[in-house]
Every structure is written in C-alpha cells, then in structure tokens.
C-alpha cells in the first residue's frame, strides 16, 4: 500500500526516469557535492551554479510523488540535497550506513566530515547494518550527536537461495572444498586463508579451497599459494554470478570469511541460508551474525593459526559442522528475511512520523 520511488546517481544534469524495477520508477540525476578535498573551490562554484536548477527538479519530484519519507543509502552528496528538501517539505529523513561509507569517513577531509556531522544531526533516524558501524561513525565524527539511531541489517534473497540448485556452478570442483567469495583486495583477507591452508598442511591436514571472485590481488594470491606450497589446494574461479556463488555455497563443506574489516557481510547470511557452517574473523559487525559455537566459528582477525585450527575442526568434526549449519540456517532465515526487515522499516517510519 506504499508508493515507492527510487532515485540513483546519474550523469545527466536533468532529472529523468531511467527505468522501472518491478513497476517501481527509477529516477536519476547528477548531484554535485558542495565539498571536495581535491578541488574545493571548483566544487563550491559548480555546486552554487547548479544548485537552483537541481533543487527545482527535486522539488518537482517531491511534489509529483508526494514524498513523505526519504531513505538515503550513501551520505554525500544526496544527503546534502535531500536534507534541504526535508526543510522545504517536512517529511522523514533516514540515512543508512552500509560499510565502506562508514569505514572511509576517516579518509575524508575536515570540511566533508563537518558537513556530514551537521546533516546526520538533522536526520530523523540514522540506520546502520551493524551496531559497530554506527559506533564507527560516532568515533570518526567526534562530537556528533545522533539523535536517533537503530541497527537494521540488509536481507538475504531467501527465495533465490531456495531456487538455486547445487551443481549449477559446474562439476570441475574438488569433492570436498572450503569456499570464500568476494573482491580480491587486501581487506578481504584471502591471503590469511591461504596461510591457514599451509599451517593445516604442516599439521597433517590437507584442505581444498575454492575462491570465487576477482580483483587486483589475484596475481599476488596465486604467487603466495605457490610460495607456500598449497597451489594444488587452491582453485581460483574468477568472477561468478550471484547465482553461481549461491550454487557453490550449496556444494561446499563450509564458508570462510577472513576479512580485516567489514560492515555487516551479507555473504555470511547467504552461506548460512544455504545450510553451510561458517568461520569468520571476529571484526566489526560479524559477531552480530556469527555467534561463536552456535551459528558459526569466530577467530581473531589476522590470525592464520587460529583460522587453521577452526578449519581443521570444521572439516574433521562432522557432527559439530552439521549443528552449526542447522542453527545458522535457522538464524539467517529468521533474522534476514526481507519481509520482516521491510516491516521494521515501516515501523521506524511510523515511529518517526509520530514524533514529528
């Protein structure tokens, strides 16, 4: 019963409808940030020139769609313009932090941080996919006072997961393998998983690893696997579609996430929903989904020895692995159901509107 409009970043200076997703209109327009660490004067001048034109078009959209609640998924520059729109039309303003947008705050210059701090304090509600992410925002933006904040994770595509069959990703895979998936960058900690394979091998346990994903660290990781004598135990598949990754999850022995930093990694919930045991780094929002010994195993960050110990236990103790998988699946299907999360969104909107 709610009318929804999606607004996305675009290259065009004029507001236009780009497409429709499930009959939901998607509009786009280029929004210029009023601040820039590289070109501060240029950013300010261009924003001043285009600001009236931009606001007129956004006001037209707000009137046409009768907007009474705006949910922003990335702070700048959208928060600047829709924050002003809130002053004109009233309504409820939500700002959501997903992960990198919070972790990268410390890289922004002081002007950008001051602007974000000011706008966050004007928001009706600040949402974070994890409680630790909200704490990160408050620690970086020292002195910021979030009037209201809530933790609300993203949902897992449970209907898609149920429809995916094991084996869709191909048959040229080890019979029993560990899976890790993601962008191959230093932050994802794939190097730690490879180091854990070497340590497990030194203890007499040979583990097979499948890596789904690509990125700038691929060649370094291949070189590392050769140098550590486990190249025959690691299979790099390159980029895979989301459906292929889900299929790999359904056929793997267990899922591994050894990241050095995360927000609330949805890939863990997806692996759990696929009925697989999970082992992950004890960082950021991960402990909010992986409850050590109950829905998965947590290991200290950047500790390949502890990771090796956890992997060996998962692979050798079948009863323990199956218990984690069962309890993790129940947790994921209950807590990361999109319908339940949508009801929580609506509850937050109604709560904020009642306090206006």
State where each predicted segment sits.
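Aromatic "clamp/platform" in nucleotide-sugar-dependent glycosyltransferases that forms part
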Residues: 260
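Conserved acidic donor-binding segment of nucleotide-sugar-dependent glycosyltransferases
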Residues: 292-293, 297-304, 313-318
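Conserved donor-binding/catalytic core segment of Leloir-type glycosyltransferases
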Residues: 169-188, 194-198, 210
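Donor nucleotide-sugar binding/catalytic pocket of nucleotide-sugar-dependent glycosyltransferases
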Residues: 8, 27, 95-98, 116-163
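Nucleotide-activated donor-binding/catalytic signature segment of Leloir-type glycosyltransferases, i.e.
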Residues: 222-240
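Short hydrophobic beta-strand element within catalytic cores of glycosyltransferases
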Residues: 277-280, 290
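Short alpha-helical donor nucleotide-sugar binding micro-motif in glycosyltransferases
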Residues: 239-240, 247-252
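Acidic anion/phosphate-binding donor-loop and adjacent secondary structure
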Residues: 2, 105-106, 138, 147-149, ...
């Amino acid at each position: 019963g709610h009318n929804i409009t999606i607004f996305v970043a675009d290259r065009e200076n004029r507001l236009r409808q780009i497409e429709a997703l499930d009959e939901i209109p998607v509009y786009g327009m280029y929004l210029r940030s009023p601040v820039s660490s590289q070109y501060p004067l240029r950013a300010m001048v261009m924003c001043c020139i285009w600001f009236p034109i931009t606001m007129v078009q956004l006001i037209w959209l707000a009137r046409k769609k009768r907007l009474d609640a705006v949910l922003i998924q990335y702070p700048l520059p959208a928060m600047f313009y829709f924050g002003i729109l809130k002053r004109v039309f009233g309504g409820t303003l939500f700002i959501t932090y997903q992960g990198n947008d919070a972790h990268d705050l410390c890289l922004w210059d002081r002007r950008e941080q001051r602007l974000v701090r000011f706008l966050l304090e004007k928001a009706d509600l600040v949402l974070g996919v994890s409680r630790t992410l909200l704490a990160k925002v408050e620690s970086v933006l020292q002195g910021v006072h979030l009037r209201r904040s809530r933790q609300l994770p993203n949902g897992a595509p449970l209907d898609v997961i149920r429809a995916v069959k094991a084996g869709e990703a191909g048959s040229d895979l080890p019979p029993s393998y560990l899976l890790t998936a993601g962008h191959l960058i230093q932050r994802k900690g794939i190097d730690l998983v490879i180091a854990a394979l070497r340590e497990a091998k030194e203890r007499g346990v040979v583990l097979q690893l499948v890596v789904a994903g690509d990125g700038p660290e691929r060649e370094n990781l291949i070189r590392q696997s050769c140098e550590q004598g486990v190249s025959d135990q690691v299979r790099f598949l390159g980029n895979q579609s989301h459906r292929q990754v889900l299929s790999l999850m359904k056929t793997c022995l267990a899922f591994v996430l050894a990241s050095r930093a995360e927000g609330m990694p949805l890939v863990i919930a997806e692996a759990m929903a696929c009925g697989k045991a999970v082992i992950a780094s004890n960082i950021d929002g991960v402990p909010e989904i992986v409850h050590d010994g109950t829905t998965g195993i947590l290991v200290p960050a950047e500790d390949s020895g502890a990771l090796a110990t956890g992997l060996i236990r998962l692979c050798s103790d079948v009863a323990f692995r199956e218990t984690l998988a069962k309890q993790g699946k129940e947790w994921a299907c209950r807590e990361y159901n999109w319908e339940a999360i949508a009801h929580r969104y609506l509850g937050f909107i109604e709560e904020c509107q009642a306090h206006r």
